[in-house]
C-alpha cells in the first residue's frame, strides 16, 4: 500500500468515526468545496439523490439525521487503490416516520484528491428502502 493509499484510508476511517460521534462539521471539513455525494437509493429514502457542494452535502446529513436513528454502523472493510477508497459494512436503524426497525448492508465509494473527499457514492441493499414503506 502506498503512503497516499494509507493516508486516504485513514481519512475515510476518521470520517466513519466522526459519523459515529455525530460530528457532521468534521466530515464537512474533510470535503472539497465542490464535493459530490450521490446516494443511489430508492427515492422513498429522504437522502436519495445527488448533493453537490458542501452546503448541499450538509442537507444530505440533515435529511439522514431527521429521518433515522442509527443504532449500529459497523465498517467491515476499507480498501484503497490510488485515489479511490471502498468501504463495506452494515447499518441498523429505526425510521422515525414509520417506527420500523431496519437493517441494510452497504458499499460506499470515496474518491479523494489532495487529502480531500471529491466524491462519495452510496449503495445499500433494499432493506433500507423497505423500512420507509
Protein language model regions, located:
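Short, low-complexity N-terminal intrinsically disordered segments enriched in polar/charged residues
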Residues: 1-29
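Short charge-dense sequence patches
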Residues: 6-17, 36-41, 57-61, 82, ...
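Hydrophobic alpha-helical core bundles mediating ligand binding, dimerization, or RNAP-core interactions
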Residues: 12, 16-19, 31, 61, ...
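Hydrophobic pocket/interface hotspot
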Residues: 12-15, 27-28, 35, 53, ...
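A solvent-exposed, acidic/Ser-Thr-rich amphipathic alpha-helical stretch
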Residues: 26, 32-80
